[in-house]
Amino acid sequence: MNNDLQPIVLVDEEGIETTFNVVTKLDIEEKEYFLLSPEGEEDVVIAMQVVQDEDGEETLAPVENDFEIEMIEEAYATLFAEEE
């Protein structure tokens, strides 16, 4: 786990704020991803991609593409294996 990344707060569609711990950041095929774990729920990990919104600002969007999820899982497994 990359401990030098600070927790982030995300706001859902209903305006509810949730704090997430950053498990790690991955750069895959010129795209940037964050693996996030809701605070207090270390067994849950959510993959988010850095995207630009309509104003050109960087924001996070959930990864829903099965191919991208598989790439992220493989990259994370490789990273985890290297840390052991």
Curated annotation (Swiss-Prot):
Belongs to the UPF0473 family. NCBIfam families: PRK13678.2-3. It comes from Clostridium perfringens (strain 13 / Type A). InterPro entries: UPF0473 (IPR009711). This is UPF0473 protein CPE1777. It holds the Pfam family DUF1292. PANTHER family: UPF0473 PROTEIN CBO2561/CLC_2432 (PTHR40066), UPF0473 PROTEIN CBO2561_CLC_2432 (PTHR40066:SF1).
